[in-house]
């Protein structure tokens, strides 16, 4: 009987060794990749941290600047409001003073002129109290009173209108009639009642007769 020899398992052993070698290499590669991934993650975190720090450092000055600008704007607004309030108060005070001045002017407008007339009143009362019957003395008193009245008119800027020989002015004269006369037409011939002006305003026009056209 012939004995047959069993086939050897060398190829299987080589395959197993090759597989083990490949697995080891794969494990080493995976480990290396994992290390690289960890380093990359750490680097990324470091970079992110740096960027966050930079951003925070950038934002902080911007926030401080904005806060400073806001405070400056608030202060400016407060000053503007105070200035406006003072201007309004000053304007109101000026308006009230003006109203008071106008009221006083209306109330006491004639005060000065009335003071000028007081001596005239004194002279008239003295004349009435004189019972002597002296006509010459009475005339003298009337003349003195008239001078006092003219002085009061002058101080009060009251001017007499006695336009004899002047051209007729409808703004200052009132014609009663037209009469034949040697004067040029529309010339005042006679004054029946004298007129008066206060400054440039006519208090009373003069009553006159006017020369008729020839």
Swiss-Prot record:
Keywords, sorted A to Z: Chaperone, Cytoplasm, Stress response
Q: Where in the cell is it found?
A: Cytoplasm
Principal place where this protein is found?
cytoplasm
Biological processes per GO annotation: protein folding
> Pfam family of this protein, just one?
GrpE
- Report what the protein is called: Protein GrpE
Per UniProt, the ranges with Polar residues bias are: 1-13
Tell me which family the UniProt entry assigns to this protein: Belongs to the GrpE family.
Cross-referenced NCBIfam families, in alphabetical order? PRK14139.1, PRK14140.1, PRK14150.1
Annotated stretches, region: Disordered: 1-61
Summarize subunit and interaction data from the UniProt record for this chain.
Answer: Homodimer.
SUPFAM superfamilies to which the protein is assigned, alphabetical = Coiled-coil domain of nucleotide exchange factor GrpE (SSF58014), Head domain of nucleotide exchange factor GrpE (SSF51064)
């Amino acid at each position: 009987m012939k004995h047959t020899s069993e086939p050897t398992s060398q190829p299987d052993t080589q395959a197993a060794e090759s597989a083990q070698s490949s697995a080891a290499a794969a494990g080493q590669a995976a480990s290396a990749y994992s290390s690289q991934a960890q380093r990359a993650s750490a680097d990324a975190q470091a970079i992110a941290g740096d960027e966050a720090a930079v951003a925070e450092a950038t934002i902080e000055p911007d926030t401080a600047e904005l806060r400073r600008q806001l405070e400056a704007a608030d202060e400016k607004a407060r000053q503007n409001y105070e200035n406006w309030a003072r201007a309004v108060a000053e304007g109101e005070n000026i308006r009230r003073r003006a109203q008071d001045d106008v009221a006083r002017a209306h109330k006491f407008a004639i005060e000065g002129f009335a003071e000028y007339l007081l001596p005239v009143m004194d002279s008239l009362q003295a004349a009435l109290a004189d019972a002597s019957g002296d006509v010459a003395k009475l005339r003298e008193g009337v003349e003195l009173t008239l001078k006092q009245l003219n002085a009061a008119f002058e101080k009060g800027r009251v001017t007499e209108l006695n336009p004899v020989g002047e051209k007729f002015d409808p703004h200052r004269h009132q014609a009663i009639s037209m009469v034949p006369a040697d004067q040029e037409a529309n010339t005042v011939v006679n004054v029946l009642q004298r007129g008066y002006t206060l400054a440039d305003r006519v208090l009373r026009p003069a009553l006159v007769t006017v020369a008729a056209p020839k």
